[in-house]
Amino acid sequence: MDMTLESCRRFVEVLASDAPAPGGGGAAALVGAIGTALGNMVGSLTVGKKKYTDVQDEIIALKAKCDDLQKQLLDQVEADDKGFVPLAKAYGIPKDDPNRDKILEEATVTACAVPMHIMELCCEALDCVAVFAAKGSRLAVSDAGCAAVCCKAALQAASLNVFINTKSLKNREVAEDMNRHANVMLNKYCSVADEIFNEVKAGFGQ
């Protein structure tokens, strides 16, 4: 079942159940899509306004990018579900099966791919949100701050879905390479998100 075609209420109900999916990865993707859409909204409220004529072309281009990022992030909700299936099946293989370790290793690497991609998409989204916050409509600057917070949460949530899988990999070289890539994104873009949030908050005298 493609949960992105369900209502928000239904998604949350299934998320709260004992169903194997959606889980943290799917939730991260959805939160990332929401954060991206919030940034995109700031762009929508900026385009066409005389006060922001000088940045129209830049904002329009960023909106087009966010349209694509939103779609990709929503696609990752279902992709995360499908990526988990082989891993769940692998854990069900009898421990005395000589092929179990190999199958489990491959499934674990596959399970890392989607949350890693979610992280990458959230980083791209935060680059856009930073511009929306700096150059977009001042009437929607709080929404730009909310967008940054959502994208940061999605980034961090997705990272945990990477780390829980890399921890169990036998091939430590592959695991550490993934961990390194994830941590680089976390270190850079959590700071980007915090800077956006703090600047928006400071603008309200807080």
Q: How should each PLM-predicted stretch be described?
A:
Residues 17-40, 140-158:
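Conserved phosphate/anionic-ligand binding catalytic regions in large, soluble enzymes, centered on
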Residues 41-53:
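Transmembrane signal-anchor/signal-peptide helices with a preference for the extracytoplasmic
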Residues 50-89, 185:
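A structural-propensity feature for long, helix-poor, extended segments
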Residues 80-149, 153, 165:
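Amphipathic alpha-helical interface segments
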Residues 118, 125-128, 140-199, 206:
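Preference for long, well-ordered alpha-helical segments
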